[in-house]
Amino acid sequence: MKGGKMDKLKPIIAIISLQFGYAGMYIITMVSFKHGMNHWILATYRHVVATIVIAPFALILERKIRPKMTWPLFLRILALGFLEPLLDQNLYYIGMKATSATYSSAFVNALPAITFIMAVIFRIETVNLKKTRSLAKVIGTAITVGGAMVMTLYKGPAIELFKTAHSSLHGGSSGTSSETTDQNWVTGTLAVMGSITTWAGFFILQSFTLKKYPAELSLVMWICAMGTVLNTIASLIMVRDVSAWKVGMDSGTLAAVYSGVVCSGMAYYIQSIVIRERGPVFTTSFSPMCMIITAFLGVLVLAEKIHLGSIIGAIFIVFGLYSVVWGKAKDEVISVEEKIGMQELPITNTSTKVEGGGITSEVNEGVTNNTQV
């Protein structure tokens, strides 16, 4: 029983761990942008690092189980590299620069809802509002997104949970938010919305691709390699300054290495496994937790204050996530019960014998013997 419970907890622990990784990436990436890092170059180096890290494991560990590459598979992998490494990441970076990190991160929390809608359209998820489990997934998704929006749109009074010695150093940081009012919010909003939509599409296409190419490490290697090629081409077109490619011991290099190893290599692999086992909706349902983790890391590391809106939103997110996970768990229970029921159906072997002037039908494994004279 312990092993069974642990198997159910592993995907949850893995996805929650990824949220810590993403929170760290947001902080490091913002620092690198402030020091002049170009987002096209960052996306390119990020996938160079990810490919180098993942390739040895994929080539060695999956050499016997790796499916043969075909043109349809190659085109799917090319589309995956186009959707997430190129479009999603660069659109998000553009949106974050045009608006603000807080504003753009709020839209990330729409990812579970968009993924759920796409999953229903492509019949990966089924919805029957007469069933409690389906209703729980729909309501839970709405509550999760709503809670994340509350954290962003309703600030409320500051609540100082931890008294820090560095509080006074960050007292003037609140004025920085006013700087974003002069920026192009329309362009930024459209860019972030496009980013989240392509990310959701990536999860859906990945779930289909895994059915044809069930070698997670190899798939991640191919996605990262495609991301490297596509981002390199885009960078050569969009970035004219050769010095932007310069690599040094700075925040830009740290951002590329960290995001490449943690948020591309490890994240793609973990997400592939969880998607195969629990589906794309379950995988994306935990993304709003990144905002909560970032808020608490901000308190501990940057001596920031948590506001009432953040606490209220966090409570909503927890309830929403519980509702979605409960609905998915019920789906799995129903699926297992149906499989067991199919296996337990009686198999009847009917033999027919001709005896004299009549026909005798005998059911060996069943309950009845019928004789026709």
Swiss-Prot record:
Pfam families: EamA (PF00892). Keywords: Membrane, Repeat, Transmembrane, Transmembrane helix. Residues 23-151, 198-325 form the EamA domain. GO terms for molecular function: transmembrane transporter activity. GO terms for cellular component: membrane. SUPFAM superfamilies: Multidrug resistance efflux transporter EmrE. It is found in: Membrane. It is a multi-pass membrane protein. The chain crosses the membrane at residues 11-31, 41-61, 67-87, 102-122, 139-159, 185-205, 219-239, 255-275, 281-301, 306-326. Belongs to the drug/metabolite transporter (DMT) superfamily. Plant drug/metabolite exporter (P-DME) (TC 2.A.7.4) family. This is WAT1-related protein At4g08300. It comes from Arabidopsis thaliana (Mouse-ear cress). The lineage of its organism: Eukaryota, Viridiplantae, Streptophyta, Embryophyta, Tracheophyta.
